[in-house]
C-alpha cells in the first residue's frame, strides 16, 4: 500500500480530522501533541513518532546535485521530494534507484502521476492542501494505486477429494466484491484466485468480508510480493486482494478461523506452469473464471479455466529469493 501523508503546517484541525477519517498514514505537523489528541496516527514532528532529519528527510530537487543528495538520504530513511515546477523526470530518476521516495503533491492529479511514474510509482505522497475535499479525493487515488498482478488462465487438470484437514477462513475488515479474490497456492511458485463469499446461497448467508482460502499449509500472496502461510495470518495483518483484471488492493485481517473440514485438491496447468491448492470441499468455496465470474469447487470440472498467478524463484520466510527450491 502506498503511503498517504498530509502536510498540516500550519495546523488546521478540520484538515487533520478529514485526513485521519480518510485513512492518512501520517501527518506532518509542528506539534505532535495536537495529533495525539485526535487519534492514533503517526505524527511527523520534532516531538513525533518520526523525526525530521532523522527518520524522514525533505529536499527540493533543483539540479543533478540535489537529486544525488536525495538518493543519498534515501539510504537513511524516507525522503520527501519537491520538484519546483512539478516535472516528472527527477521523480523517474529517483524512483528508478530508490523505493523510499515520497512525492510532495498538491492535488489528486499530481498524486496519480507520482504513484504511477515508471509504473511502480513513489513509495507514497505528501499532500499539502487547504481543501478537505481534496484530501478525500487523494485518499481515493491512493486506494486505487495498488500494483497489478499478472493473472493467467489455468486449465484444471485434476480434482480429488483428499479427506479431512484444517482449513482457514480469512475474515477481512473490508466488504469484498464479486470478481476479486485472494491468491493462494500449495507452493510459492503459483497461486489460484479464491473468490470471497459474496454470492447468495440457499444454505448460508453471504459473508462478503470472508475468503475461505484453503488448508493451513498453503501460501497466500501478500502486499509487496511477499507470502505467508495461511495458518500464520493474524489480526491486523494485511493481505492482497486482486481484481480479475489484475489491479490489487490491501485488506486488513480482522479474524482467522481454522476449522476441521473435508478437503479437495485442485490441480491446474498454464503452459509449463502448474498450480495446486487444497480447499474445503463445499459448494460455497469458489475460484474465479477469466471473465470474473465465480465457479464453485463443487461444480468445477477438468478442462475448466480459472485465474491464477505464477511467481518466479523460491521463498525464504515469505520473501522471494534467487536459489534452487523444489516444491511439489
From Swiss-Prot:
Pfam families: DHQS. It comes from the Archaea. GO terms for biological process: amino acid biosynthetic process; aromatic amino acid family biosynthetic process. InterPro entries: DHQ_synth. One of its GO terms (molecular function) is 3-dehydroquinate synthase activity. Its EC number is 1.4.1.24. It catalyses: 2-amino-2,3,7-trideoxy-D-lyxo-hept-6-ulosonate + NAD(+) + H2O = 3-dehydroquinate + NH4(+) + NADH + H(+). Transmembrane segments: none annotated. Keywords: Amino-acid biosynthesis, Aromatic amino acid biosynthesis, NAD, Oxidoreductase. Catalyzes the oxidative deamination and cyclization of 2-amino-3,7-dideoxy-D-threo-hept-6-ulosonic acid (ADH) to yield 3-dehydroquinate (DHQ), which is fed into the canonical shikimic pathway of aromatic amino acid biosynthesis. Belongs to the archaeal-type DHQ synthase family. This is 3-dehydroquinate synthase. It comes from Methanoculleus marisnigri (strain ATCC 35101 / DSM 1498 / JR1). The lineage of its organism: Archaea, Methanobacteriati, Methanobacteriota, Stenosarchaea group, Methanomicrobia. The gene is aroB'.
